[in-house]
Structure formats: C-alpha cells, structure tokens
Amino acid sequence: MASLKNKHFMIGLSLTFIVALFSFLAAKLPILDKVGALTIAILIAILYRHFRGYPEQYSSGITFSSKYLLRFAIILYGLKLNIFDIIGQGSKLLAIDVGVVIFSIVMMLFVNKLLHGDKNIALLLGVGTGVCGAAAIAAVAPIFKSREKDTAISIGIIALIGTIFSLIYTAIYAIFSMTTNVYGAWSGVSLHEIAHVVLAGGFGGSDALKIALLGKLGRVFLLIPLTIVLILIMRFRSSESSSKGRISIPYFLIGFVIMALVNTYVTIPSVLLNILNTISTICLLMAMVALGLNVAFKDLKNRALKPLMTIIITSICLSSLAFIVVHWLYS
C-alpha cells in the first residue's frame, strides 16, 4: 500500500514537472516567447482537466507541487533582489513603486465593487498587478485564505493581461517619440511580471531595460512590507469579527527575505545564480500546473469574466497615470 502511494505521488509530481518543462522550453520559441511559460503551463493544465478530468489518484504529488514547490520557488525568488541596488536607484523610482502598489490594490477593489465581482480574486489581482504578478499572488494567497482555484484563475489572468500590455508597450515605443529613461521607468513601474518588464524594456535597448528592472525590483522588494501590513490587517479584522480563524504567517516569506539578504551581501557566481533562477522558474511552473489542474472551464466562465474586466480597467488606469508621472519626473 505504501509503495503504491509513493508511486502515485511520483506520477503526480512527474506530471507537473513534464508540463512545466514543456512550457519552459516552448516559451523560448518564436511567438510563444511572447505568450510566456506561465500562461502556457496554466492553459495546458486547464485543458488537461477539461478533457481528461482531475487525476484524483495522483493528487498527493500534485498537491505537493501546488503547496511546497510553490513556497520553495518564492524563497528562491528572493535571489532576484539586491537591496543596495534598490536603495541606490533613488527616492523617485521607489516612491513611484510605493504609489503603484497602493493604487493597484485600491483601484482594483474600487472597480471590482462597481462590477460586483469576487473580492478575494480582486485582492489577489491587486497585489499581483502592484508587485510582481504570479509570485506575489502566490505569496499573499495564504494570508487571504484563498482557494486554489481562485489563486490559479488570478495567476492565469495576470499572466495573460501582462503579456498583452507588454506587447502594447513595445508598439507604443515604436510609434511615439520617447526617451529610453522614460520608457524603461514606465515599463518597470507599471507592467505585471518581471518577464513582461524584460520583454517590453528590452525592446527599448539595454539602458531602458536596466532602469525597467530597477523599477520592477523595487516593487518586488515592497512585497516584504506589504505582506506584514496585510497580515496585521487580516488579524485585526479576524479579532474584530470574533472569528476563530487564525491568520497564519506565511513563513516561506522569511526565506524570501533571507535569500534577498544573501544576494545583497554575498557574491554568488553568475553560473550558480542562473541555475538557482532556473530551478525557481521550474518549481513555479510546476506549481502553476498543479493549480491549473484545479480549475474547470465552468470556473473560468463563472468567475473569470468580471476579474478580467477589472484588471483591464485597472491596468489601463495604472499605465496612463504611471506614464504621466514618469514623463514628468524623467523628461
């Protein structure tokens, strides 16, 4: 019996790995490189669920990917941060980053209320839009006690919209006259994922990409204080409503902070850093596959439309406002 359970666990884990690896490699191909590995992984998982059903007998391995590998990926995500670089970028860019995070969450909740959408998904999308997409959503989902299908829907939506917006940014840069500093800062402070920032920022050249990444990594850094604030708010609301539900601290975020400190104070060889970043990406993709397997098409039909409209409206407002502020400060 134990050997059978172990076999089912390994099959479930292998399923998420195979789809993740395929998505990782497929995202390097022309056209698909614009779609992104996250979007590919989630779409394949949802399609698998639709045509083959949820592989219940392999759920232990799938659940391991969606929980533990996801947390491990977020811990390694901290290696993308160098605190000295973020502090050294100056107060202007960091101040914009703070404004972007606050605006994204508040605007998302405001639009969601007008559309009578799901508040939990709106919160996840607000944090994801303001900070760093899928990783931020996965980090705060335990704080909000989000269901796995809501987390998967949110990540799928933000991966899709971020890809579309990054392509729109490149078109705008090609058509309109814009300095590399303005374009880079605009991309960095307003696009959803690091991959989207790289896609759009790289189109403006190395100088634009450099300032874009600084702007984006400043937002990633803000994940640390943001989660602390969210935990305090949720605990206050929980005690105020005399709820017995305890708001737990996502301790893997401590690992995220430790990795950020390690990358700041320790010189890690570039080869090792690239290997660790690849491992982080694969683990994150495996988690996305596992989350996607929890989403049925009826869930997308019933729960994704309003959040999709909400994030589009919010992203348009964010991009417009960010451009005005960046143009004013960097022109």
Curated annotation (Swiss-Prot):
<keyword id="KW-0812">Transmembrane</keyword>
<feature type="transmembrane region" description="Helical">
    <location>
        <begin position="273"/>
        <end position="295"/>
    </location>
</feature>
<feature type="transmembrane region" description="Helical">
    <location>
        <begin position="9"/>
        <end position="26"/>
    </location>
</feature>
<keyword id="KW-1133">Transmembrane helix</keyword>
<dbReference type="GO" id="GO:0005886">
    <property type="term" value="C:plasma membrane"/>
</dbReference>
<feature type="transmembrane region" description="Helical">
    <location>
        <begin position="93"/>
        <end position="115"/>
    </location>
</feature>
<feature type="transmembrane region" description="Helical">
    <location>
        <begin position="247"/>
        <end position="269"/>
    </location>
</feature>
<keyword id="KW-0472">Membrane</keyword>
<feature type="transmembrane region" description="Helical">
    <location>
        <begin position="183"/>
        <end position="202"/>
    </location>
</feature>
<comment type="similarity">
    <text>Belongs to the UPF0324 family.</text>
</comment>
<feature type="transmembrane region" description="Helical">
    <location>
        <begin position="31"/>
        <end position="48"/>
    </location>
</feature>
<feature type="transmembrane region" description="Helical">
    <location>
        <begin position="69"/>
        <end position="88"/>
    </location>
</feature>
<feature type="transmembrane region" description="Helical">
    <location>
        <begin position="154"/>
        <end position="176"/>
    </location>
</feature>
<feature type="transmembrane region" description="Helical">
    <location>
        <begin position="122"/>
        <end position="144"/>
    </location>
</feature>
<keyword id="KW-1003">Cell membrane</keyword>
<dbReference type="Pfam" id="PF03601">
    <property type="entry name" value="Cons_hypoth698"/>
</dbReference>
<dbReference type="InterPro" id="IPR018383">
    <property type="entry name" value="UPF0324_pro"/>
</dbReference>
<protein>
    <recommendedName>
        <fullName>UPF0324 membrane protein SA0329</fullName>
    </recommendedName>
</protein>
<feature type="transmembrane region" description="Helical">
    <location>
        <begin position="217"/>
        <end position="234"/>
    </location>
</feature>
<feature type="transmembrane region" description="Helical">
    <location>
        <begin position="308"/>
        <end position="330"/>
    </location>
</feature>
